[in-house]
Structure formats: structure tokens, C-alpha cells
UniProtKB/Swiss-Prot annotation:
It comes from Marchantia polymorpha (Common liverwort). One of its GO terms (cellular component) is chloroplast thylakoid membrane. The lineage of its organism: Eukaryota, Viridiplantae, Streptophyta, Embryophyta, Marchantiophyta. It holds the Pfam family ATP-synt_DE_N. The gene is atpE. This is ATP synthase epsilon chain, chloroplastic. The keyword Membrane applies.
């Protein structure tokens, strides 16, 4: 088992032993099982899948860092939302609005970067819900 702690600035999001986790890093996805080599990696905005008691849970992570050492995985994130706590209708509306804003920001670098960040967050939330419904 892996001891997983996911911490946001204002709360502990997850603190328990798990069987497996799949994270979105800046260079792609990484799967972590017990006895994994020590790793420190940056996390991209995206989804995380956690397996506990042969059941998968899905969460949207808003970027951060992960450190694994000696079967202890600590994840520090800007924010996180469990798929079960995300309202589908609100997430869908936020995604569509973010997509429109990203298209409208084209040509203005500063607005484009800000809009891309909002779009990636909205997309991660929607993907977390969609993936959770398939598990």
C-alpha cells in the first residue's frame, strides 16, 4: 500500500493508504504503485485516478508537485476537487464559457495565457466527472 496525502493551501484533500495512483505530470501521465522509486515531479492541471479497495476515485487537480519516497506520496496542489463533488451542469457551463473566452483572446498574448489556464481548469473538472461516470 501507498500512503497518500493530497494537500491544498486551505485543507487536506486526501489522507489514506491506497493501492495505485495515476497522475498528470508536465511530461505526461505517471502511474505509481507500492515500492515505486523516489520521485519529485511537477503536476499539470488535470485528473488523478486513485485506486483503493479495487475501486477507482477521480479528482481534478489544479497543478502542483508530487513527491514519493518510501511508499509515502505527498501531493501539494493549488486546488483539488473530487469528481463526486463537482456539479456536472455547472462544470459544463464553465467549460463552454472558458472555451469561448479562449477563442476570443486569440491575438492578445496576456489574455490568451490567462484564458488557457481557466480553460485547462474547466476541462480538468469536466474530464474528472466524465471519467468517474465510466469507472
Amino acid at each position: 500500500m501507498l500512503n497518500l496525502r493530497i494537500m491544498a493551501p486551505n485543507r487536506i484533500v486526501w489522507n489514506s493508504d491506497i493501492q495505485e495512483i495515476i497522475l498528470s505530470t508536465n511530461s505526461g501521465q505517471i502511474g505509481i504503485l507500492p515500492n515505486h522509486a523516489s520521485v519529485l515531479t511537477a503536476l499539470d492541471i488535470g485528473i488523478v485516478k486513485i485506486r483503493l479497495n479495487d475501486q477507482w476515485s477521480t479528482m481534478a487537480l489544479m497543478g502542483g508537485f508530487a513527491m514519493i519516497d518510501n511508499n509515502n506520496l505527498t501531493i501539494l496542489v493549488n486546488d483539488a476537487e473530487k469528481a463526486s463533488e463537482i456539479d456536472y451542469q455547472e462544470a459544463q457551463e464553465t467549460f463552454q464559457k472558458a472555451k469561448t473566452n479562449l477563442e476570443e483572446a486569440e491575438g492578445n498574448k496576456k489574455k490568451e495565457i490567462e484564458a488557457l489556464l481557466v480553460f485547462k481548469r474547466a476541462k480538468a473538472r469536466l474530464e474528472a466527472i466524465n471519467m468517474a461516470s465510466k469507472l
